[in-house]
Amino acid sequence: MNTVFPRIQRLPPYVFNVVAEMKKAARARGDDVIDFSMGNPDQPTPKHIVDKLVEAAVRGTDSDYVKPEHLNEEGTHTHRYSVSKGVPRLRRAMANWYKRRYDVDLDPDSEVIATIGSKEGLAHLAFATLSAGDVVLVPNPAYPIHPYGVVLAGADVRHVRLTPEVDFFEELERAIKETWPAPKMLILNFPGNPTTQCVDLGFFEKAVALCREHQIWLVHDLAYADIVFDGYTAPSVLQVPGAKDIAVESFTLSKSYNMPGWRVGFMCGNPTLVGALARIKSYLDYGMFTPVQVAAISALEGPQDCVGEICEMYRSRRDVLCDGLNAAGWKVEKPKATMFVWAEIPEPFRELGSLEFSKRLMDEAKVAVSPGIGFGEYGDTHVRFALIENEHRTRQAIRGIKRMLKRTNT
């Protein structure tokens, strides 16, 4: 029997699975591991969103009381199949969210599609638009689905270095000139995971102009639009005039509303790309459970105080972690956005590389982080902390790290 699966063979070990095995082994030894390894929000979803889910799920089965929002596309009860692109009411809520936030006008029918989390949308967009021989430009380091969605689609990735010591646009322009065949797509993510890098609207104006000049599709992952600090505001690429001619943008409710397990996201912008994603999804899924879509409408259109509270929680955790690490002798910068801290490995450990250093942190400090190598070769000088532990546990982690650093320096 043929057991050669070329598509799978192109994939390296997934960073989160590697770290999960390390945590499993440590806990089997009885270690109390303080876990900063995965950006998986630890707090519950706001109550009004959960209440709407329950209401839609329960009342959607009651023939004596069925509201219009409890119906799927065909006007039948919510426990039946939905539609892959999302019910119209949800797509309108998504379009309205963009209008309120960015003053961007979107057609809910042709320029908005609901996705089962942003990760699914990004991967299936690659499947819908790419094939063998196509080349996609992806920053390095990057969130794994950005390059490996391309790989799974059978296309090729051209990595573009994204580190403080280089000019990203110089690197990008060189990559465009040196790549043959010409790149078909550019994938961006700001505020960035894992690097936490932030940009202004001028950055997107330049990116859109460059992509228009070279006829390159632009895909932007805006997962951390709401998780911003110290007065920073994350721009949307769709704010750039003419961006919809060549660009789409994805967003997820996972971080802004503490809904990671719900798997709710959307992609907006260029109708050709949105249409391609809608077509391939029509063959692959029937969309989210309709009560989840009803609850997502409540999230987008209901009280937004919860978003500010979630952001403030991450800011406070950021301050505790960064202040504590700096006091312990591990110099890190406070990020202006995201739920991560991207920390350069301390000098005495730098030659280990990020994977071995992560193992040392686990063994000696009982702290789990993500090794930067899992996000690309240019990430190997760093590790990523996800701000998913409370402040008490974070201070406990800092004490363990401080002891580890002190042993090394003596």
Report residues per predicted region.
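N-terminal small-domain helix-loop-helix segment of the aminotransferase-like
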Residues: 2-116, 124, 300-302, 408-410
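Helix C-cap/helix->beta junction micro-motif
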Residues: 26-29, 153, 213-214, 328, ...
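Conserved core segment of the aminotransferase class I/II
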Residues: 53, 239-240, 244-315, 319-328, ...
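PLP-dependent enzyme catalytic core of the Aspartate aminotransferase-like
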Residues: 96, 100, 350-353, 360-370, ...
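Conserved PLP-anchoring active-site segment centered on the Schiff-base-forming lysine
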Residues: 128-150
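Active-site phosphate-binding strand-loop segment of PLP-dependent enzymes
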Residues: 158, 162-230
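Conserved glycine-rich beta-strand-loop-beta hairpin in the small C-terminal domain of fold type I
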Residues: 297, 312-322, 332-345, 379
